[in-house]
Each structure stands twice: as C-alpha cells, then as structure tokens.
C-alpha cells in the first residue's frame, strides 16, 4: 500500500472530494500523542480538524496533529481549498517516507454522529496513523473516522 491523499482516494472511488475546516489551532501535546510523535508531553502541536466530503456528503472527520516546530506557519494555509500534504512538502520540505496505522471499527459517539449526519452509535472505521518524514522523523499523528455505510478499505495481499 502507498500513502495517498483523501482527494486522490475519493477520485479513485468515483467521488468528487471536498473539505470543510472544523477547527485549527495550537494545542499542548497530550501524553498519548506525545509518545507516538516521540516528543515531550506539552510540546506544541498544530491541530487541524476537517470534515471530508464525497459528492458533497460527509465521508469522514480527520484530526491531524503536527509537530509545530517542523511546520511553524502551517496554520496560515487554507485547507478547505488546498491539500495539507502539498503545503507541507512545498513550504517545509516534508515528504512522507512511511506510516504506521491501526484500523478498528468503533461506534460513533454523539458529536461525531452529528458531524457525519449519521445516527449515534453507527459503525465508524477508525484509523490512527503516525506518518514519518524522509528523515524517518514522526511528524503527524492522524485520527480518521470514516462512515461505515460509505467507506470500505481495499487491500491487495501477496504471498
């Protein structure tokens, strides 16, 4: 598998991608995320929460946590119109070398259900991913919550 953007994934599936920024700002790294990003609890993170759309309908919610010192001006970007991944590469020279992720099914809590326009406790596909730069440095911790009724994962497996 290779790392692809939400927009590329949606286009491959025949959807028109869209994005709404729900929130953006600086936060102190909680201990669990700090451990994943190999930083100290309390270090500054950029937190960007986006609603991802497919043909104008909610598909997922993404919570990106980026180590602020590697992308200090990233909050100035317009991530409703421009891909975060492209800004990281263009403005900070950050390209993803690899990522590690955990995938699980979870019931939608009320707040996510409202945002995704689904009944509470509906099935969500939850992905937690740590993405590493070409220097093998963890830069981003990403939580994605996909609607279980609209999204399926496809993998090709080899012996």
Model regions: which residues?
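Short linear motifs at protein or domain termini
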Residues: 1-15
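C-terminal all-alpha effector/ligand-binding and dimerization domain
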Residues: 4, 16-159
């Amino acid at each position: 598998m290779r790392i692809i953007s939400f927009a590329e994934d949606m286009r491959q599936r025949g959807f028109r991608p869209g994005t709404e920024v729900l929130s953006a700002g600086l936060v102190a790294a909680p201990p669990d995320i700090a451990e994943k990003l190999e930083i100290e609890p309390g270090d500054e993170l950029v937190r960007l929460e986006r609603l991802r759309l497919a043909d104008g309908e909610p598909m997922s919610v993404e919570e990106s946590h980026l180590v602020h010192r590697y992308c200090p001006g990233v909050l100035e970007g317009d991530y409703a119109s421009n891909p975060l991944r492209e800004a990281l590469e263009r403005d900070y020279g950050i390209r993803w070398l690899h990522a590690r992720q955990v995938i699980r099914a979870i019931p939608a809590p009320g707040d996510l259900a409202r945002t995704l326009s689904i009944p509470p406790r509906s099935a969500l596909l939850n992905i937690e991913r740590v993405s590493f730069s070409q220097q093998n440095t963890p830069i981003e911790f990403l939580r994605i919550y996909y609607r279980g009724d609209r999204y399926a994962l496809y993998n090709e497996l080899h012996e």
